[in-house]
Regions:
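Short coil/turn linker and secondary-structure boundary residues
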Residues: 3-4, 43-46, 116, 135
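Short, charged surface segments at domain edges that flank catalytic/cofactor-binding sites
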Residues: 10-76, 113
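Short, cysteine/histidine-rich loop/knuckle motifs that typically chelate Zn2+
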Residues: 75-78, 127
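Histidine-centered nuclease catalytic patch
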Residues: 79-123, 132
């Protein structure tokens, strides 16, 4: 069976087409949160179906806020996100952040000290998720306080 060969170009093209669709990209992203090979302490407290429902709700809310858009908008920068993967990445695991498309869809934990659960899941772009990576709400309050103290923006 030619498609059983993971390096078969036909299979790579079919996989690539699916993974560059919104559904394929988002489901792979959600599924990665449950991958047993992930070395993480953040085991989601919600199901894959809950993630999908939260995503659909996010789209609806964004469509209401921005009626002339598709609703596929980053919660942080309010720009539309994309769904693009490189050809031939299926089964390769984590391939590093080099070359990641900054506008791609991503799932963030609002408070990075907590796991994926209701009221802690944010749909955003990769760029915003990376910029927020090493901070938490306490840090943000400190940044705002220091900015006010030094007169930033006045």
């Amino acid at each position: 069976v030619p498609y059983s060969d993971p390096n078969d170009l036909r299979r790579l093209k079919v996989d690539h087409a699916y993974e560059n669709s919104e559904r394929g990209y988002v489901l792979r992203n959600i599924g990665s949160k449950y991958n047993p090979s992930r070395q993480t302490k953040w085991i989601p407290e919600i199901t894959k179906q809950d993630f999908w429902q939260l995503y659909m709700n996010h789209i609806q809310i964004m469509k209401e806020k921005f009626p002339k858009t598709s609703g596929r908008i980053c919660s942080y920068c309010l720009k539309e996100y994309s769904f693009m993967r490189r050809l031939g990445t299926r089964g390769k695991g984590y391939t590093g952040q080099k070359g990641q498309v900054q506008t791609n869809f991503s799932i963030d934990r609002y408070d990075s000290r907590l796991t994926y659960k209701y009221n802690n899941v944010v749909f955003c772009c990769v760029g915003c998720n990376q910029r927020k990576r090493d901070s938490n709400p306490n840090d943000w309050n400190n940044y705002i306080r220091v900015g006010r103290e030094i007169g930033y923006g006045t």
